[in-house]
Amino acid sequence: MKEEIQNETAQTQLQREGRMFSFLFPVIEVIKVVMASVASVVFLGFGGVTLACSAVALAVSTPLFIIFSPILVPATIATTLLATGLGAGTTLGVTGMGLLMRLIKHPGKEGAASAPAAQPSFLSLLEMPNFIKSKMLERLIHIPGVGKKSEGRGESKGKKGKKGKSEHGRGKHEGEGKSKGRKGHRMGVNPENNPPPAGAPPTGSPPAAPAAPEAPAAPAAPAAPAAPAAPAAPAAPEDPAAPAAPEAPATPAAPPAPAAAPAPAAPAAPPAPAAPPRPPSFLSLLEMPSFIKSKLIEALINIPGFGKKSNDRGKSKGGKKSKGKGKSNGRGKHEGEGKSKSRKSKSRGKDKEKSKGKGIFGRSSRKGSSDDESS
């Protein structure tokens, strides 16, 4: 056990010493390169000098060897020296050139084993944010609550909007319902890989829902209000029992009659939502507020109480009130002020006089005022 502990301590010390002197490895590599380059230059220098000397010796010894034959022995010696010089020069030059080429082609191959691991490059660090963004987007797309919205919400909004509280407000509510339904269809995404939420309708039902907007064709039924011709009977306002007749004006759905003609024109657009798979474009989202405004304005114009007011009703409002106002506690008030006041007078037990100058039929209200004066 002690020997193992000693061996481990020795190894740890060696590792620490190696880490301490690890910075010397690159210095040693640099020293090697410098030494090799210096040696190659020296060898090349010596080779050049020997070649030059051998050339001079040949130039001098050759004529002497030819002309002066007695000096044959020194000439042979000189030739041998020249040959050795030429060989040494060539070998030195080749070795020097080989060292230089090796340094140029493979500068750090010798110390590659001791070199540390390669660090990440600057380009890889710059590309890291894009890589992280792509991974985050892929994960967010697969989250059901964030990436893919089910079609159930859009369709439920459209159905809620179609329910109108009153007959007069049908056009307005239907326009809002259609616009919301279109928004829902555009915002929804085909949830192929995403199951619908717990309270949503089944996936098979959504395609059948858009056919519902064709129902607004029903407003054509108000053609029956031709019956309101009954109000002509009040030509005999002298009878006190006549006020029982005002029940007829309560029934008339006559005001919807002018709105009934333009109302069917608005539902002509709903067939467009039959193609929900198209993704919402940026321009369509920008045009949505103007579309909603136009639909609201059309609906308000078609409402008789807001948009279209008859000329006679305006005149009756601008005219004078009957003189019998103080005596009869408001009996002589003009009926052009609204049907709601006539209903209040019924509940209080007061009989209000009917005038033929209603704004709907375009008759003047002077007869009602004269009757009030006579009473």
Swiss-Prot record:
First and last residues of every Sequence repeat: 207-209, 210-212, 213-215, 216-218, 219-221, 222-224, 225-227, 228-230, 231-233, 234-236, 237-239, 240-242, 243-245, 246-248, 249-251, 252-254, 255-257, 258-260, 261-263, 264-266, 267-269, 270-272, 273-275
Keyword vocabulary terms for this entry: Lipid droplet, Membrane, Repeat, Transmembrane, Transmembrane helix
InterPro entries attached to this UniProt entry: Oleosin (IPR000136)
Biased composition (Low complexity): 211-251
Compositionally skewed regions (Pro residues) per UniProt: 193-210, 252-280
Ranges of compositional bias, category Basic residues: 316-331
UniProt region (Disordered), positions on chain: 144-284, 303-375
Transmembrane segment boundaries: 21-43, 55-75, 81-101
Domain of life: Eukaryota
Known tissue expression: The full-length protein is found in the tapetal lipid bodies of immature anthers, the proteolytically cleaved C-terminal product is found on the coats of pollen grains. Not found in flowers, developing embryos or leaf tissue.
UniProt topology in membrane: Multi-pass membrane protein
GO cellular component: membrane; monolayer-surrounded lipid storage body
Comp. bias (Basic and acidic residues): 148-179
Short name of one Pfam family: Oleosin
Region of interest (Hydrophobic), ranges: 33-112
Family note: Belongs to the oleosin family.
Name used for this protein in its record: Oleosin-B6
Region (Polar): 1-32
Subcellular localization: Lipid droplet; Membrane
PANTHER family per the UniProt record, alphabetical: GLYCINE-RICH PROTEIN-RELATED (PTHR33203:SF26), OLEOSIN (PTHR33203)
Residue segments, region 23 X 3 AA approximate tandem repeats of P-A-A: 207-275
